[in-house]
């Protein structure tokens, strides 16, 4: 749904629906008055299985959200004791905290642009009711890796509409270009989307086909080295009605890439990607190279030139590197453990 002018809802019910694969959208060209309800799909909770979600509407109380969604929202045994399956990430301590029956009343409103962990009993939609954000939004991010924390920050799409993620979605009005190295760490200019089955993070950057961020989808970004912090921006110019799943990629890129997978028996432990394009270098190409989310991942590579000690999940190089470069490979496995490497 696209509204070129102002949006006003005096008393009617305006509802947008989603399921595990598709998300309704609304785009407002002017101001917005009155509430909408976005029924946002959230996966079932399990061992290490959470969805990372942000509110696609503004002005929503966390306690009223928990009350409205008391049936599908996992609680008690599903999320532990007296906890709700709504939590936040504190990167200063690398810690996840769920709201409880004792703390939910003082939780305040959802901070749009901030991500939260959520889970439902068996996979269902949760109702978010509030106003539509019609201006550019920012979310503070900070690097706490110098102390007991981490570089990672959980942010989210604050709009009830998709956002362009990378240059293949839109050449300039996309999340990576707008934020880039001024906000994100040079080695991690990428979007790290959590796989809800608990297997880890998928990485989306400019080596990925056109990618779009679904309404209310949360993801990790790495702040730059400034401990004083900065902010990432989500802008109206990034908005698009194109999209599908939580993170949706278009057709395969017309470039050369190799995926190196590490196996123990038939069990795939992890993988790392080599990407080749004539405009890239053997050193760091921000937005194309991407460090691994886990510093001790089972398999990674290192930059061929100007290696600063980061394990790479995506190593992007020029086309001539396919024949001439020696690419350092890092494997973290216990002594005596059998493994094999396959190229795809």
Residue ranges and their predicted role:
Residues 16-18, 54-55, 87-89, 119, ...:
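Beta-strand-rich, repetitive solenoid scaffolds
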Residues 41-44, 55-87:
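Conserved "landmark" site that anchors the functional core of diverse proteins
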Residues 16-18, 25, 35-55, 238, ...:
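Boundary/junction segments of secreted and surface-exposed precursor proteins
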Residues 41-58, 147-163:
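Amphipathic alpha-helical packing elements
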Residues 11-17, 24-26, 60-63, 67, ...:
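Generic marker of "main functional regions" within proteins
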Residues 14-18, 36, 66, 79, ...:
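Intrinsic disorder/low-complexity signature
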Residues 79, 90-111, 117-344:
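Compositionally biased Ser/Thr/Gly- and acidic/asparagine-rich
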Residues 1-48, 68-74, 121-125:
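Extracellular beta-strand-rich, repetitive "passenger/adhesive" scaffolds
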